[in-house]
Amino acid sequence: MNKKKIMSILVSAFLITNLSSNIIFADIKENVYINQYSEGNRSQPIAEKLVPRSEIQASATSALTGEGPEKAIDGNTSTLWHTPWAGVDIQINPQSLTLKLGKTRNISSICVTPRQEGTNGMITDYKIYSGDDVIAEGKWKSDSSDKYVVFDNPISTDNIRIEAISTVGDENNKHASIAEVEVYELADTPVKLAESNNKVINNGNGGNYEGDISEISLLEEGTAIIRFTNNGSSLFSISNNERTNEHFHVYINGGAIGYELRKQSGNLATGSVNKALNAGINTIAFKAEKGKGYSIYLNGEKILTSSSITANFLSTLEGLNTLSLGKTDRPSGSNEYNFTGEIDFFELYSKPLADRYLKERTGETTSKDLPFPEGAVKTEPVDIFTPGELGSNNFRIPALYTTKDGTVLASIDVRKGGGHDAPNNIDTGIKRSTDGGVTWDEGKIILDYPGASSAIDTSLLQDDETGRIFLIVTHFAEGYGFGNSKTGSGYVEIEGKRYLKLLGANDTIYTVREGVVYDSNGEATNYTVDNNNELYENGNRIGNVLLSNSPLKVMGTSFLSLIYSDDDGQTWSDPIDLNKEVKTDWMRFLGTGPGKGHQIKTGRYAGRLLFPVYLTNASGFQSSAVIYSDDNGATWNIGETATDGRLMDNGDRASAETITTNTSGGVGQLTECQVVEMPNGQLKMFMRNTGGNSGRVRIATSFDGGATWEDDVVRDENIKEPYCQLSVINYSQKIDGKDAIIFAIPDANYPNRVNGTVRVGLITENGSYENGEPRYDIEWRYNKVVAPGTYGYSCLSEMPNGEIGLFYEGRGSRQMSFTRMNIDYLKADLLQDVPAANIKSYTTNSENNIYDPGDKISLNVTFDQTVSLIGDRTITADIGGKEVLLTLANSKGGSEYTFEGTVPADISNGNYTITIKGKSGLKIVNVVNKVTDITEDRNTGLNVQVGEEVQSVDKTLLQDLVDSTSNLIKEDYTEESWILYEKALEVANKFLVNEIAVQEEVDAAKPTLENAYK
């Protein structure tokens, strides 16, 4: 049969997705260099292994002393190979790094890591050689991301040379540098051992794998990849369901993504990382490498690497008999970590797959930045404090404050002894911004106690009347911190006056009175103490009372220190110890609620300065309170705690002084806190808490400026509280016509500190208390995740222009980040205008688009973004009035799906348009959880030919002739002539009704009929 070739009307396309790293492919045959995603994820699963650095020898055309070629293979990206400072013209005299590989190897890819600090010598144009043969060339971006060169066909070679053709930096094309090179060689071909698709799982049900796992259970290494909609608990597992603790699983829990390899005897390997997930579909890969360790990849990024020379993956577990999706199959009564959600696909391979492939595959679900509506502002985060500044590699506990003059102050713990809390050498640092947080000065230390003494957890406040700025901080002597703080104020009261207590040998008590040290009998000694806590004997310095080796030293308890500035934060006073005024002897710990204080603006207590604090009693039970001043900070008092008066289960009222965890009767501990003001001057204290139905923010109310608190401490069910410091401020302007507060905290369950979220709360009056005071409720009208991923302590401040500044811990103790946003941004629903995936094109796999009845037909449906298809993975096509069921056969790149079916056997020949019938039961969801509507019929714009193409036939003249003979009279003709006429008429009518009659037949019938009746 002759078939005419008909081209499809629409052409398929692939979604281009960006990874955090710039990964470059090198097509050796065509010498073309393109981003790996611009070809639509062409890679196939590949296993490769790193050529051991110990087997590589590096040399270079030239090198700077101390930065030789060996630095490029030392496994440390902080070191580098660098050409001499004298420089050469690289474009005339190219510089190169040569790696001798020890033996001939099949090289599959190379990863080049540029220098991580600065740009000098960073290579852009490059060539890569094997011997004298160019095996790759191209151009790299001038940034610090890893650069991959991937060979479609492995290169058999014993050496690799990387040549710099052009570079950037202080003097373009004068220097060359490389931080690290990794060379990968081909490993054994991976085998897909298990696969499962299209699972809808409800509370762990619906994800059982029925295949044989005997080979899987022996794996010493391998790779698993899973695509799913965002939900919690176990994603997939391999377990012995007859033992409580004999399993491996990969899970998500709140904001944590992790894995657990566990035996009856205990954990063999675990790891987790806090990372933000897409609202819709996500892709995770887990890789186990024997003798090396374990890795996790999420949405195009390698997020976790755990090294282990004993890593043997599943082979270390006994009796493995189940593979499950959406749960960990364990004996009855055990926690199976049940998952509810949808799993697009799961694949398990016998080998550790290539790092670049896993970034590519998981990168199919990389989320693009959402567009901002007009008027919305959100700046990219900048790190205010970074490792190496102020003599420290670690910082924590950000505080932020905007002064009356518009200066923004950012204070921080400068943790010189490491990222941990006290005991530690911790100073107080500060930076200033005079342009609303756009730029910052170089910063300085403003409080530095001697040795490893600590100043931890700062809080800032300015007196609007005097302009004086106060900073309070918790202070410990060397060797002490929250955990080992001793009960007591650190002072001794004598005749109504309180004096600093010093302890000598055998804890003999001394006191400091106007700088002179008195013994326990009240007699003056030869010791004196100056304002810097230096200890003197007969005028000779012999120590410092804050140091552990001093003959006399302060009590090992917490102290509250206050410093102040009268010049907008440029200079600061010496510290003043507030324990003398505010700490009582039943308190074991008294410390700041880090962040900021508050000055009451309205009502009977207007002008009062207050700082949130929290404290513990002798048993360690925590309670929240405030210290306050009514004389512009000259003297300070401490109010009752929010614990005092709370109703316990036994009907008694709690006392912060005596309550214990054993006697608390359902009353949880209240800890770090912040305070805001209601329209009438009433205070609301927001508190971190633990025990007693914790997990949500607690709010206390004060009618007397913080001196006492309402007995009922409200649990706000709207705000998760993962036992992390929170920040809340009053906003100066009305929002939606109402007074408002701004609130920030990780939006996660304990113990995860992830997904930094800023909320807008509108203050609404709702009735009154029994004392007649108005009752205010907070309507949390808007919220936005502004810092996905790791997010710890934070502090908010309103910028001079009305924007909101947020200073937060972005990555442990090393990344102290700052961002600005406006109210329009916080109010905007960024997802509202993000479209669901659209079908971009339809194509068929036929070269000529002509089919016979009964032929197989394939329809490719390409979306404009990555999607998952969940549910009934079929579509129905209408071809020539016949319904054709098409079933999903395969997919490519997450955006192109191929459906296959059969052309109906009873369809007539002809040219037909393909229409896709509307349907339900198939969910097409993207990374932001938007679902594509396919309930309406869709014209694909594709035409297909069934059978031979039928040429158009003109039957008009023949029909006219037949019609003209209808009035003939038989008697006017001879019998023989009439018979001839009837036969000719029969033939003519036959061709008129015959749909496949050709023009030649029709044309021949006309003269035959004419001759018959004439």
UniProtKB/Swiss-Prot annotation:
UniProt superkingdom: Bacteria
Under Enzyme Commission nomenclature, its number is: 3.2.1.18
Q: What is its main location?
A: secreted
Q: Which residues form a coiled coil?
A: none
Q: Which CDD domains match?
A: Sialidase_non-viral
Residue intervals of the F5/8 type C domain: 39-186
Task: Please give the InterPro entries that the UniProt record associates with this protein.
Answer: ConA-like_dom_sf, FA58C, Galactose-bd-like_sf, Glyco_hydro_33_N, Sialidase, Sialidase_fam, Sialidase_sf, Trans_sialidase_dom3
An annotated GO BP: ganglioside catabolic process
Q: Which UniProt keywords apply?
A: Glycosidase, Hydrolase, Repeat, Secreted, Signal
PROSITE patterns, alphabetized: FA58C_3
- Catalysed reactions, as listed in the record: Hydrolysis of alpha-(2->3)-, alpha-(2->6)-, alpha-(2->8)- glycosidic linkages of terminal sialic acid residues in oligosaccharides, glycoproteins, glycolipids, colominic acid and synthetic substrates
Q: Does the keyword Manganese apply?
A: no
| Any GO molecular function | exo-alpha-sialidase activity
Locate the active site.
D421, Y912
Entry's Pfam families? BNR_3, F5_F8_type_C, FIVAR, Sialidase
- GO cellular component entries: cytoplasm; extracellular region; intracellular membrane-bounded organelle; membrane
Q: Where are the BNR repeats?
A: 431-442, 563-574, 627-638, 700-711
Recorded family membership = Belongs to the glycosyl hydrolase 33 family.
Q: What is this protein called?
A: Sialidase
Q: Which organism is it from?
A: Clostridium septicum
